Amino acid sequence: MAALVVSETAEPGSRVGPGRGRISRGRLANQIPPEVLNNPQLQAAVQVLPSNYNFEIPKTIWRIQQAQAKKVALQMPEGLLLFACTIVDILERFTEAEVMVMGDVTYGACCVDDFTARALGVDFLVHYGHSCLVPMDTSVQDFRVLYVFVDIRIDTAHLLDSVRLTFTPGSSLALVSTIQFVSTLQAAAQELKADYHISVPQCKPLSPGEILGCTSPRLSKEVEAVVYLGDGRFHLESVMIANPNIPAYRYDPYGKVLSREYYDHQRMQATRQEAIAAARSAKSWGLILGTLGRQGSPKILEHLESQLRNLGLPFVRLLLSEIFPSKLSLLPEVDVWVQVACPRLSIDWGSAFPKPLLTPYEAAVALKDISWQQPYPMDFYSGSSLGPWTVNYGRDRAPRGLCQPASDKVQQGSRGGSPAPACESCNCADQKATSPAP
């Protein structure tokens, strides 16, 4: 599933900006022309890519052609970079655009790098592997962003068998995953609901079932276990931190193993509380704004600055694309750091830094804006976050709703189970964004 961000909308052939035709939103939905979709040469070229990875090549080519784009940039996580050269060759062969690969590290949707793309003269950016989390500031004409989720098909039957062998019928299970597996998650939920109380929780603006490393929903007390579909533990740990009393399981779609997973909540919380306690006696503060794509939020930075000014605490601002202990050690006069980039950097690696490295939430606790929360909040991009130390708090955009606790209702995906809700309910999908990006 892909989502398109455009700077203007008009009928095909209309002239908006210097020579770019625009298309209405109604024409954007799955109307790839037959000459593109059924092109035998294109079909043969796409066969080089893995058949279970949906890179949406025909749609991408059509979007580029419709935009009359001349310079296209591709941005993707490192796990997909091995396919980048092949995609470049295909796009350049079937469009008139020059295509380049943006090779800087891309950890998540927060790293979408439209700033660099525009600086390079790019008029069309394709971001692979993540949902459209960050609304684009499309006030600059003739720049578009296409999000390609890269839906990955897996052996759903094995997943279902694994769940049935592990959990007794009638169990209450919550299913979560990353965006690549949301369509499989929805299909599995439909199959399992006959024997289990299945919920696919949603933390808006994310899709039903989708979680991020920094954003996960609180589950209802009735949920007996949460099952995460995906490789690695980074995203799983997010929902575990938000729900410390619910047993967690991970199904690895590549290794085909369903395993019980554990997290040392006591150690994590003790470490973070120690850092907060140390920060309360700090006389000099450092505020780090992440510059890796759109990771940093100027709005949060401004809030922190205001709080420190009100308390008469001196601070220094530091812009960094990536944050390392060796870099911060070059400023020894700073007593405590607050990083507005990725909360998990502090949670996972904060103890590796010589000075306390707080998240904006932890800074709010240290400055007594809020008390320590149980469980630890994972609401950094949530539309129902706790306070102005999160990205979407108080933002003037269409109502997002709440981080929904799990219920016994399976969220229905549209268009055959694709993760369409990520785009249908997102302000940045196929329309002009109404607010600046964080």
UniProtKB/Swiss-Prot annotation:
<feature type="modified residue" description="Phosphoserine">
    <location>
        <position position="418"/>
    </location>
</feature>
<keyword id="KW-0963">Cytoplasm</keyword>
<dbReference type="GO" id="GO:0005654">
    <property type="term" value="C:nucleoplasm"/>
</dbReference>
<dbReference type="GO" id="GO:0032991">
    <property type="term" value="C:protein-containing complex"/>
</dbReference>
<dbReference type="GO" id="GO:0030054">
    <property type="term" value="C:cell junction"/>
</dbReference>
<dbReference type="InterPro" id="IPR016435">
    <property type="entry name" value="DPH1/DPH2"/>
</dbReference>
<comment type="subunit">
    <text>Component of the 2-(3-amino-3-carboxypropyl)histidine synthase complex composed of DPH1, DPH2, DPH3 and a NADH-dependent reductase. Interacts with DPH2. Interacts with RBM8A.</text>
</comment>
<keyword id="KW-0043">Tumor suppressor</keyword>
<dbReference type="GO" id="GO:0051539">
    <property type="term" value="F:4 iron, 4 sulfur cluster binding"/>
</dbReference>
<dbReference type="GO" id="GO:0090560">
    <property type="term" value="F:2-(3-amino-3-carboxypropyl)histidine synthase activity"/>
</dbReference>
<dbReference type="InterPro" id="IPR042263">
    <property type="entry name" value="DPH1/DPH2_1"/>
</dbReference>
<keyword id="KW-0408">Iron</keyword>
<dbReference type="InterPro" id="IPR042265">
    <property type="entry name" value="DPH1/DPH2_3"/>
</dbReference>
<feature type="binding site">
    <location>
        <position position="110"/>
    </location>
    <ligand>
        <name>[4Fe-4S] cluster</name>
    </ligand>
</feature>
<dbReference type="GO" id="GO:0120513">
    <property type="term" value="C:2-(3-amino-3-carboxypropyl)histidine synthase complex"/>
</dbReference>
<comment type="pathway">
    <text>Protein modification; peptidyl-diphthamide biosynthesis.</text>
</comment>
<keyword id="KW-0597">Phosphoprotein</keyword>
<keyword id="KW-0949">S-adenosyl-L-methionine</keyword>
<dbReference type="GO" id="GO:0005737">
    <property type="term" value="C:cytoplasm"/>
</dbReference>
<dbReference type="InterPro" id="IPR042264">
    <property type="entry name" value="DPH1/DPH2_2"/>
</dbReference>
<keyword id="KW-0539">Nucleus</keyword>
<feature type="binding site">
    <location>
        <position position="342"/>
    </location>
    <ligand>
        <name>[4Fe-4S] cluster</name>
    </ligand>
</feature>
<feature type="binding site">
    <location>
        <position position="214"/>
    </location>
    <ligand>
        <name>[4Fe-4S] cluster</name>
    </ligand>
</feature>
<comment type="function">
    <text>Catalyzes the first step of diphthamide biosynthesis, a post-translational modification of histidine which occurs in elongation factor 2. DPH1 and DPH2 transfer a 3-amino-3-carboxypropyl (ACP) group from S-adenosyl-L-methionine (SAM) to a histidine residue, the reaction is assisted by a reduction system comprising DPH3 and a NADH-dependent reductase. Acts as a tumor suppressor.</text>
</comment>
<feature type="region of interest" description="Disordered">
    <location>
        <begin position="402"/>
        <end position="438"/>
    </location>
</feature>
<feature type="region of interest" description="Disordered">
    <location>
        <begin position="1"/>
        <end position="24"/>
    </location>
</feature>
<keyword id="KW-0479">Metal-binding</keyword>
<keyword id="KW-0411">Iron-sulfur</keyword>
<keyword id="KW-0808">Transferase</keyword>
<dbReference type="GO" id="GO:0046872">
    <property type="term" value="F:metal ion binding"/>
</dbReference>
<dbReference type="GO" id="GO:0048144">
    <property type="term" value="P:fibroblast proliferation"/>
</dbReference>
<dbReference type="GO" id="GO:0017183">
    <property type="term" value="P:protein histidyl modification to diphthamide"/>
</dbReference>
<protein>
    <recommendedName>
        <fullName>2-(3-amino-3-carboxypropyl)histidine synthase subunit 1</fullName>
        <ecNumber>2.5.1.108</ecNumber>
    </recommendedName>
</protein>
<dbReference type="Pfam" id="PF01866">
    <property type="entry name" value="Diphthamide_syn"/>
</dbReference>
<comment type="similarity">
    <text>Belongs to the DPH1/DPH2 family. DPH1 subfamily.</text>
</comment>
